[in-house]
């Protein structure tokens, strides 16, 4: 059986919610894009738990602890690899692995090789998001001087 093919990284920012506030529309989008990168690649249940924790901490720091906790709880439920969604854990891989969903799994050597080819583009997109998220903060600081 041929190895599944990893699709190039795509992100919709904060799936099913706002990327920021009305006056700062991308305030925590970098948190979501980082989480999307993890979700795209998938992996073990422990890796997912750690990734979900990171998005909660990131949004807590970018916005408010209550929002971070809320997002973490929602990605824990909604990002299951067993939901056939565009934002599930491992969404870069085909949903089906034979007759069962892909679910949680350690990447094979072949899958890791595919990922290594595509990760630089995913990292570049993430760096772009981080830069965009920091820009309004730097502009506001300059305005206050």
Predicted regions, residues:
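Extended terminal accessory/targeting regions
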Residues: 1-145
């Amino acid at each position: 059986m041929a190895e599944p093919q990893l699709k190039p990284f795509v992100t919709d920012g904060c799936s099913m919610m706002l990327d920021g506030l009305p006056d700062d529309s991308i305030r925590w989008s970098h948190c979501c894009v980082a989480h999307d990168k993890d979700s795209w690649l998938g992996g073990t249940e422990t890796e997912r738990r750690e990734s979900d924790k990171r998005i909660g901490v990131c949004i807590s720091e970018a916005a408010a602890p209550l929002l971070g906790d809320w997002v973490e709880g929602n990605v824990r439920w909604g990002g299951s690899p067993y939901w056939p969604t565009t934002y599930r854990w491992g969404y870069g891989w085909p949903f089906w692995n034979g007759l069962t969903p892909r679910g949680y799994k350690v990447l094979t050597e072949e899958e890791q090789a595919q990922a290594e080819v595509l990760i630089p583009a995913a990292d570049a997109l993430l760096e772009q998001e981080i830069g965009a998220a920091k820009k309004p903060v730097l502009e506001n600081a300059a305005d206050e001087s």
